[in-house]
Amino acid sequence: MNEQFIQFPQIDPIIFSIGPIALRWYGLMYLIGFGFAYWLGMRRAKNSNGVWTTEQVDQLIYTCFWGVILGGRIGDVFFYNFDRLLQDPMFLFRIWEGGMSFHGGLIGVIVAMIWVSFRQKRSFWNTADFIAPLIPFGLGMGRIGNFINDELWGRITDVPWAVLFPSGGYLPRHPSQLYEFFLEGVVLFFILNWFIKKPRPAGSVAGLFLIGYGVFRFLVEYVRDIDPNVNTVDDLITRGQLLSLPMIIGGLAIMIWAYSRKKA
């Protein structure tokens, strides 16, 4: 029966190792994402007529990098592994044993943007609107890393493109990582970079990012496998959906505020 479904490609998550040091596909995907964001940010700075300098973009992306890493790790522990943290507080610092939370990473990036905006004496919304279109590609690459790691797969299904994941019991499952790669990494990237082709009111680009990611993540959660220990709230809504709702509501509020202020 399983022959009709797609076999998971056996990819070693470690590209190569030298002694105790190993380069993993998951880490490489994040590096590619940040590298692309850096390149695109520099390109936009050079075309910004002096609104942004390459030095300012360098500072912004470097600071956001650490915001993603620290916020993503802390968010993963507090949102999804809090019970383990209570039993073993040092788990927070063993990064190699855990994952990354997007919502935690987002909080880390917001803190980083506030700090950079203060240092550069510019509006927070100006900073947020600049960084938002740079994010989706990195999100997509992170989902490719999840796929290679054989993790965060979807629920059992009989769709023709179902994948037999080894860690998923070789049962046919939705390749939800690839759905997220396409929606959050590709579609959202093109939406945002199309949106910024014309002048937009301050905050509207950031608001659109929050809406887009929140909606796409909320939808994919319906086919993403559920962790019965942490991922559902009263069996009605997953933890990921619960965390995405404030993004959607907040994004809509920011968009309404941005355009109403423009009219005023």
UniProtKB/Swiss-Prot annotation:
It comes from the Bacteria. Keywords: Cell inner membrane, Cell membrane, Membrane, Transferase, Transmembrane, Transmembrane helix. Pathway: Protein modification; lipoprotein biosynthesis (diacylglyceryl transfer). GO terms for biological process: lipoprotein biosynthetic process. A 1,2-diacyl-sn-glycero-3-phospho-(1'-sn-glycerol) binds at residue 143. It is a multi-pass membrane protein. The chain crosses the membrane at residues 14-34, 60-80, 98-118, 128-148, 176-196, 203-223, 240-260. It holds the Pfam family LGT. Its EC number is 2.5.1.145. Belongs to the Lgt family. This is Phosphatidylglycerol--prolipoprotein diacylglyceryl transferase.
